[in-house]
Amino acid sequence: TGSQELSVRIHEFGGGVSQLIGTGGRDLSEKIGGLMMLDAIDMLEADDATRVIALISKPPAPAVAEKVLARARVCRKPVVVCFLGSNEPPADEDGLQFARGTKEAALKAVLLTGIKKDDLDLHPLNWPLIEEVRARLTPQQKYIRGLFCGGTLCDEAMFAALEKFDDVYSNIQPDPARRLKDISVSQAHTFLDFGDDDFTNGKPHPMIDPTNRISRLLQEARDPQVGVIVMDFVLGFGAHDDPVGVMIEAIKEAQAIAKADNRPLEILGYVLGTDQDPQSLAQQCQLLTDAGVIWASSSTNTGLLAREFVCKGERA
């Protein structure tokens, strides 16, 4: 989903994708050493249709990140690098630019092809909406629960939360101290990747079968400390024919659970797709709107909105 998110944002910004190579989530681990990404840079450098190369990865092993960056520095084409979960990205260099998140990476890539920034809708954060949500939530509703199909989407939202909160946990957190001890029980701010082996061993992927996510949505809705539940909905071939529609009844039930307990509950959705996907992007977003779900315009904004909704004692 990292490469899909990057390609969708490039499409939205008016750019195009000559080649998209999925390296796999473990490629930049110490064990594999970035073999696929290094090969991909070689191939794309030799490809006449490719003018700019963008690299995206879940948190890489530091030694492997250095190896990939060393290769990128000698590439004859401009390279944009987005290694999620890194601390402050390094300063841009000649021919090598760094991005903190997927939206910034897509923007830097399209600007390098000559597209003008002034011509683009950058979808800035909706601060009046953030103020509204903060005013609705009770003082004890201070936690985010992220229920994701896409691993990189989960990572990006989780790292946005980590910039402001210390008590952030996940089943895919590389730091053992922040990894959930029991994936069936959330603690504080919890971000779950339902596509990870923890949940898919012997079961269909959540992009196809929403069963696991539905039961967890209802579980999280019963927690009075939860202010916002975040979910992604991935479009494309091989995904569910109606990824939002299949969750609507569960969303309504979650809202009813909170209402019966006399408290609000914000559900934040993000539909990853384009107007050219087999499922209708506009229709999927409309289903969310009709169900009273706030929807975000990008993976980056999803993480930022969720984080800001539950910030206490701050003014937007």
Model feature map: region roles:
Residues T1-A316:
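Catalytic-core regions of core metabolic enzymes
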